[in-house]
């Protein structure tokens, strides 16, 4: 989960190769957290990195409001904006975001202690069915909002790459790598960039 950008693990390397072949417009990283935490979904915590576009923020908020509608209807606890940010570039939400997608993490209580059912510290019972239902609901809610905004999602995705190519925000437009470097290091870099 923390190795998307650095790809030090074989699994991460394989994941990124597949991700880059597909380049999804929306990417959700479904997770579980400690058993006593309510469900978490976007929008992410402030501050946002300066390269995250207004559109990425806007769609995260739209999706989060849609999730809230379903959670409120069912009296399910949730939170947003408090903990999980979009600063570290190597998470399953930030890597897609920094690559033009709407990247989000959804955190459900349960984790390895959850089992089929577990009593939380406030005396409630958290079941596997609850956990599945919450993730299922946010998954379909994400698809619902995406279907209502499909043209804008595609347009903004294209715009992200067009602006990156024609009007990059960073200080540098080009990097020069000396040919005098060790050939294995150059091959590793080329492989990583591919």
What are these regions (language model features)?
Residues 1-194:
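Structured catalytic-domain cores with a bias toward divalent-metal coordination
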């Amino acid at each position: 989960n923390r190795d998307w950008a650095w790809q030090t693990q074989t699994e991460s390397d394989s994941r990124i190769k597949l991700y880059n072949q597909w380049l999804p417009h929306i990417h959700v990283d479904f997770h579980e957290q400690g058993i006593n935490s309510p469900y978490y979904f976007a929008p992410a915590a402030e501050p946002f990195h300066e390269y995250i576009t207004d559109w990425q923020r806007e769609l995260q908020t739209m999706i989060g409001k849609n999730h809230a509608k379903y959670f409120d209807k069912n009296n399910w606890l949730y939170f947003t904006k408090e903990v999980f940010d979009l600063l570290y570039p190597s998470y399953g939400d930030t890597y897609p975001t920094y690559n033009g997608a709407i990247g989000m993490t959804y955190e459900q209580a349960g984790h390895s202690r959850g089992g089929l059912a577990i009593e939380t510290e406030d005396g409630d019972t958290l079941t596997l069915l609850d956990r599945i239902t919450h993730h299922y609901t946010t998954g379909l809610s994400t698809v619902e909002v995406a279907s209502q905004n499909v043209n804008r999602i595609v347009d903004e995705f294209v715009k992200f790459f067009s602006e990156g190519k024609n009007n990059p925000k960073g200080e540098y437009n080009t990097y020069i790598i000396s040919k005098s470097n060790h050939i294995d290091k150059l091959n590793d870099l080329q492989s990583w960039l591919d």
